[in-house]
């Protein structure tokens, strides 16, 4: 595929993510459509900006673009994770947050309650709070995942337990992780924290 077609496809994929965000932003009673009183002007977070962290136990890179703490946005967050080939996300659920996952690039297998669904570039998954889910990169290349929580807040789990890129890694006990998981309403389906 030539560079023009690739650039066009990436532009359309990003546009699709924006359309989904706008549509869901206007749905009633799910937290997306309410503007926080302290955010009165729009803003842009550029490609190289955001909070670049290494996640808690496995020290995987992610970029939190919009968060409750850093941007004052209460109703939705926005993050990006580049999942390496073979990476498996533990099956878990969020008790307090709905989640949207957009597969910007790559392919994988999404667990959604008892279903196993193949996903690829351009696919979007809506995961209501309380739904078991996980994502495995089964492709030959990295999987670029864009994800959002509504209401915002769960991204703070990554901030609290992760490490800013370039800083010494935070070391926590399994008991400390369990306390944070309870605080942010995350439950793992299995009890093996080393996964």
Residue ranges and their predicted role:
Residues 82-83, 96-110, 148:
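Short, conserved beta-strand element in jelly-roll/cupin
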Residues 136-195:
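Double-stranded beta-helix
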Residues 115-129:
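Short acidic-glycine-tyrosine-enriched beta hairpin
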């Amino acid at each position: 595929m030539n560079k023009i077609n690739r650039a066009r496809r990436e532009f359309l994929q990003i546009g699709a993510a924006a359309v989904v965000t706008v549509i869901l932003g206007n749905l009633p009673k799910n937290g997306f459509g309410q503007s926080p009183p302290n955010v009165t002007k729009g803003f842009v977070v550029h490609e190289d900006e955001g909070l670049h962290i290494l996640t808690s136990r496995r020290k995987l890179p992610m970029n939190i673009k919009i968060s409750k703490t850093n941007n004052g946005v209460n109703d939705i967050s926005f993050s990006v994770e580049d999942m390496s080939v073979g990476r498996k996300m533990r099956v878990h659920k969020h008790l307090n947050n709905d989640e949207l996952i957009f597969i910007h690039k790559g392919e994988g297998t999404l667990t959604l309650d008892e279903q196993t669904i193949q996903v690829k570039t351009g696919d979007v998954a809506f995961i209501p709070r309380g739904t078991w889910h996980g994502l495995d990169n089964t492709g030959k290349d990295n999987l670029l995942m864009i994800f959002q929580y509504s209401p915002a807040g769960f991204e703070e789990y990554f901030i609290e337990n992760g490490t800013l890129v370039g800083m010494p890694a935070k070391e926590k006990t399994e008991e400390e992780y369990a306390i944070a998981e309870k605080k942010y309403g995350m439950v793992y389906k299995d009890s093996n924290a080393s996964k």
